[in-house]
């Protein structure tokens, strides 16, 4: 039962082969048995899950039918869940129970999904390895000595280990796509504004976007259908009709123009990953796609621009955690200043403190123009590069990550090396574009992903290309040993 995809579960429930409650109990027992090896969950919500599963079964018995009705999933622990701990992977929010549900959570709940728990993540979503969590590192099910990627590493590890069929994630600079690549999943970052950010604890507000993580493009289409849509409570939500993503999965790729940027194949890319990228291009050509080289001339400026903009926004967003209204509060503060200083020093981990300091520096008087303003100008240039490329092609293809998963602890003392792992993913966030990572092979037994980017609101195109690719390859069907 645990091997089934979301689409297979939907069919099984519709045909009454099993009930949502039966499936939920099977998965909860798998999580109890296997998750101690992975540490992919921060909180389990067994009672809620059983209640929701029974309610979904009752709705189905009453004649209701829907692809997500009774489907089990988990939420990354930065989506507010009413009455359930929402920690953001931080000591700062270890005792925080949200008073309301995030829009993503409430939309999926009304579609009938069953919440099994909240997944582990890098603290405040700051990281590419899921090592900065207050609750300990998450292990990659493909090799328990390796990282699963981050910051949505808990969601990635849980889905890859077949603890559940799908999960929600968020992507600020690659936090859905990079862990999806490192754990053999399909992960989609939608267009900025496609999915509501209301109730999603912010890291960098102009970059954050929620999306689905699953084993197949078909499953991502089902989950995105339940997540996407306009939300008046989110001022950056875009009032654009939501297409039927599943309906667009079977479009022929004949004549589809795929652009491969020449700047992607630089010295930092593992040559074995480059080889797998070229092989995936050949598969798509066999399906009728036309491939041409494109250029993204400002790509080399993306990392420095991102690591000014994201920390700058984070330093502002995280100023609300001051030990006064909610979250961690230090013991016996001498005065208000001491309360602020010690609560933040004790509540935030070292990586979060590092990024707050970088961000506050970039926004400080005298440096704002030199750093933050320059970074925003580079951001505009990067967006323009994509617009020029998309005038010639329909989809851009390249590696998701420069390397496969690395050993836990290998980059802890070299944050720049970890930041460089986001080289291929952050441009989509800076430009607000949709991006998808799909499984494309293995290097030394570790999964590798290929990334697809498309123009604004063309998530359906990305899902279709990935789905067609997954009809002729079997990478996405492979499971880690022991799970």
Swiss-Prot record:
* Pfam families, A to Z: Amidase
One example GO MF annotation: glutaminyl-tRNA synthase (glutamine-hydrolyzing) activity
List its EC numbers.
6.3.5.7
The record's Gene Ontology biological-process terms are:
translation
**What family is it from?**
Belongs to the amidase family. GatA subfamily.
Give GO cellular component annotations, separated by semicolons: glutamyl-tRNA(Gln) amidotransferase complex
InterPro entries cross-referenced by the UniProt entry? Amidase, Amidase_CS, Amidase_dom, AS_sf, GatA
So which domain of life are we looking at?
Bacteria
Q: What is the organism field in this record?
A: Pseudomonas savastanoi pv. phaseolicola (strain 1448A / Race 6) (Pseudomonas syringae pv. phaseolicola (strain 1448A / Race 6))
Q: Which reaction does it catalyse?
A: L-glutamyl-tRNA(Gln) + L-glutamine + ATP + H2O = L-glutaminyl-tRNA(Gln) + L-glutamate + ADP + phosphate + H(+)
Presence of the UniProt keyword Ribosomal protein in the record: no
This protein is called what? Answer: Glutamyl-tRNA(Gln) amidotransferase subunit A
List, alphabetically, the HAMAP family matched: GatA
Asked if Ribonucleoprotein is a keyword of the record, the answer is no
What residues form the catalytic site here?
76, 151, 175
For this UniProt record, the keywords arranged alphabetically read as follows: ATP-binding, Ligase, Nucleotide-binding, Protein biosynthesis
Subunit composition? Heterotrimer of A, B and C subunits.
Looking at its record, which EC class is this enzyme?
ligase
Role this protein plays: Allows the formation of correctly charged Gln-tRNA(Gln) through the transamidation of misacylated Glu-tRNA(Gln) in organisms which lack glutaminyl-tRNA synthetase. The reaction takes place in the presence of glutamine and ATP through an activated gamma-phospho-Glu-tRNA(Gln).
């Amino acid at each position: 039962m645990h091997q089934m995809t979301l689409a297979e579960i939907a069919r099984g429930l519709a045909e009454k082969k099993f009930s949502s409650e039966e499936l939920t109990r099977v998965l909860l027992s798998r999580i109890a048995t296997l998750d101690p090896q992975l540490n992919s969950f921060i909180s389990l919500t067994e009672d809620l899950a059983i209640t929701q599963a029974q309610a979904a079964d009752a709705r189905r018995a009453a004649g209701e039918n829907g692809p997500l009705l009774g489907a089990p999933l988990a939420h990354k622990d930065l989506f507010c869940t009413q009455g359930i701990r929402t920690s953001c992977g931080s000591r700062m929010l270890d005792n925080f129970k949200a008073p309301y549900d995030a829009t993503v959570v409430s939309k999926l709940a009304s579609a009938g999904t069953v919440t099994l728990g909240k997944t582990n993540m890098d603290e405040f979503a700051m990281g590419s390895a899921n090592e900065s969590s207050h609750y300990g590192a998450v292990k990659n099910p493909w090799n328990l000595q390796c990282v699963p990627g981050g910051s949505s590493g808990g969601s990635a590890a849980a889905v890859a280990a077949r603890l559940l069929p799908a999960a929600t994630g968020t992507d600020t600079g690659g936090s859905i796509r990079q862990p999806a690549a490192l754990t053999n999943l399909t992960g989609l970052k939608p267009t900025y504004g496609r999915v509501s950010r209301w109730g999603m604890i912010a890291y960098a507000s102009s970059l954050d976007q929620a999306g689905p993580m699953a084993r197949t493009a078909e499953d991502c289409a089902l989950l995105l259908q339940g997540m996407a849509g306009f939300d008046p409570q989110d001022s950056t939500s875009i009032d654009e009709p939501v297409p039927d993503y599943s309906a667009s999965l079977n479009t022929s790729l004949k004549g589809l123009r795929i652009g491969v940027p020449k700047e992607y194949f630089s010295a930092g890319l593992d040559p074995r990953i480059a080889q797998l990228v070229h092989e995936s291009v050949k598969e798509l050509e066999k399906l009728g796609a036309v491939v041409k080289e494109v250029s993204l001339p400002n790509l080399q400026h993306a990392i420095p621009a991102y690591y000014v903009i994201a920390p700058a926004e984070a330093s502002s967003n995280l100023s609300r955690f001051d030990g006064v209204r909610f979250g961690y509060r230090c013991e016996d503060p001498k005065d208000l200043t001491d309360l602020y200083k010690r609560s933040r020093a004790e509540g935030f981990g070292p990586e979060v403190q590092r990024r707050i300091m970088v961000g506050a520096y970039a926004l400080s008087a005298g440096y704002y123009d030199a750093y933050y303003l320059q970074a925003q100008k580079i951001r505009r240039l990067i967006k323009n590069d994509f617009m020029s490329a998309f005038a010639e092609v329909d989809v851009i293809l390249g590696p998701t990550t420069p390397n496969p998963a690395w050993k836990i602890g290998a980059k802890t003392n070299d944050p720049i090396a970890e930041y460089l792992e986001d080289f291929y993913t952050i441009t989509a966030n800076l430009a607000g574009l949709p991006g998808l990572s799909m499984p494309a092979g293995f290097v030394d037994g570790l999964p590798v992903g290929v990334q697809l980017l498309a123009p604004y609101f063309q998530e359906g195109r990305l899902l279709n290309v990935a789905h067609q690719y997954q009809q002729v390859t079997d990478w996405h069907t492979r499971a880690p040993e022991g799970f």
